[in-house]
């Protein structure tokens, strides 16, 4: 800080500012649920329908999305994954933590925790920092297109960073918008 009390700069491990559920727009919530976990409000941390879909995809070679719920992804974000663990053991740990999270927290708290812990690349950890970094706005004021862009980044933040890979990010954003249409969160204009 300067002698007049103004901030000269910041030093941080992660550039993160947490927000509350009330600070999130319906657009960001809908984009996230439509893309990452369409049955989020219907399961208790593990979506067995999604697991069956993934298993069928593995057997047939026709993969159609992942099987991890938002709660399982939150568990991974909070506790990480040991690179030495095999995938099945890592997933089992995530399932256990996800079930515990679902017992302790409401769905609104879980989705807020998730959005506060995700990495949006370009030194933006969490939705508050990402909304500011990429769109100079707050999570409450994110449009459908902005929300879709940010949620699209979650698949691979570095690869879908709109500041670096605009074309790829725009394509991924369109995938998210199509998911929002598919699950009736938005209609065609």
Regions of interest found by a model, annotated:
Residues 1-27:
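Terminal hydrophobic membrane-targeting helix
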